Amino acid sequence: MERVCSHQLASSRGRPCIAGVQRSPIRLGTSSVAHVQVSPAGLGRYQRQRLQVVASAAAAAAFDPPGGVSAGFSQPQQQLPQQHPRQPQAVAEVAVAESVSAPASAAPSNDGSPTASMDGGPSSGLSAVPAAATATDLFSAAARLRLPNLSPIITWTFMLSYMAFMLIMPITALLQKASLVPLNVFIARATEPVAMHAYYVTFSCSLIAAAINCVFGFVLAWVLVRYNFAGKKILDAAVDLPFALPTSVAGLTLATVYGDEFFIGQFLQAQGVQVVFTRLGVVIAMIFVSFPFVVRTMQPVMQEIQKEMEEAAWSLGASQWRTFTDVVLPPLLPALLTGTALAFSRALGEFGSIVIVSSNFAFKDLIAPVLIFQCLEQYDYVGATVIGTVLLLISLVMMLAVNQLQKLARK
């Protein structure tokens, strides 16, 4: 096999050469790998890194797509049997065997730099074996971690069974029980003044809480992703507290903070602002329990945004506001709508904290979930079924509308 000194390769490609390194390209199927043999003179740190890169390429050669560009150096190439793309270990062994098949010795070239020869000299202290072996181990570990190829029938069976027991059957049971109620009774109970006011309070407070969380959740996610400061990890962990905290404990905490016994509540009452047992307390409770959804939805998407896109916009003369609205915000908008929709859904179904911080009086701050609970306490199962069905249908319509907005935002 004919080999070319790295000086000649460097001169032909216009790149700095690495003294003491010879490369001989070998075509494996549709890809070509440059194998390295090193002189005993030793290499520097940069040369060793280059050597490891070439050795790693030998292990990854089997994954080149058919018809890929080969790394030939206009020298005669030895044709080896094509390896199966699912056998990276065999390809790595061929590369390593070629790189260490014969010891390398120092032979001075025309310009006085040492080159590798195959005349049986002393072997080099540095070879491509560790890098290629490491790559082979990684490929083998990845192959062992592959999930089993389950049959589509098994996958669909498990998925549909889970969805049926966890989602479809409960909703179907509620709708089936609501269908047993006569239509005139259903309409009368669904349009009672108490029920209509409860719908209004529930959806208005949920929308306000979702809008506030949309703004401040976006800002907090931006700060956690873009800035480094003391206590960042503590703040990031504190965002998840509403997930782990029981809703009754959350209601008790809010009632204590905004009540008469805490300085915040005393200050607000001195200013004429009453929080506990009002709609404002309902909104604050909804904000508290639904706040993490916007932050956790926005963080992964913000981390994927490349800083180079903003720098490119700045280099073209765009202002910071123009860069934010035209470059940063469009890819974040679908995730922002998703987080806002999740926050709205969570606020809509909140019960445990609101039942503590609100007065639960009709025509004041009574919400639909609490009204359903009051109907169940009075053994009014028809009223609870009707109000629950109306709440379910309205929520479904609003979620479908949010999904359509997400599709428009992606376009």
Swiss-Prot record:
Sequence segments annotated as region (Disordered): 68-91, 103-123
Bias (Low complexity) ranges: 75-91
PROSITE patterns (UniProt xref): ABC_TM1
Gene: SULP1
Membrane-spanning residues: 153-173, 205-225, 237-257, 275-295, 324-344, 353-373, 382-402
Family: Belongs to the ATP-binding cassette (ABC) (TC 3.A.1) superfamily.
Topological type in the membrane: Multi-pass membrane protein
Name of protein: Sulfate permease 1, chloroplastic
Organism this protein belongs to: Chlamydomonas reinhardtii (Chlamydomonas smithii)
